[in-house]
Amino acid sequence: MMVTGEAMGCVRCIARCHLRFDEKKKQMDIEAVKEIIRQGDGLSNTLGMEFLSTPEPDIVRARMEVNDRNKQPFGFLSGGASLALAENLAGVGSMALCPGKVCVGISVSGNHVKAMAYGGVVQATAHLQHKGRTLHVWHIDITNEEGDLISTVQVTNYIITPRKNG
């Protein structure tokens, strides 16, 4: 994958993020994740995703309330918002595992098995299935507060090593 021009500036910015798994604390630096979200006007901020602390480097958790920003016209959680939640979890997980690298989603595939009504809260848990040098594969389950499955998603991330020059 070739990254050039304005996109390369974004790649350099992302690569400087200090997002990592803290071996001493046995958790991801969730405050760094939250700060990245607060600084931007990206999709995770727009949809109201809240990242939660986790005890392992290969698991990422988040929650999201179903509201006007992420519902479909009938008042249920949009399938696209569910996929965005899953891809964001996988991206954060890959970034934490690969400090100084850029992680981009190249495949997202999901199945929606139950509706989630307006005002409800979904919880998502991403588990790393494969950690290669250039590819990570994550499995994400999105559930309601009772633990019922709402969506199940697989995300593949491509890991990019930024060029050192310019």
Identify what each model region corresponds to:
Residues 9-166:
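Terminal targeting signals and extreme-terminal segments of soluble enzymes
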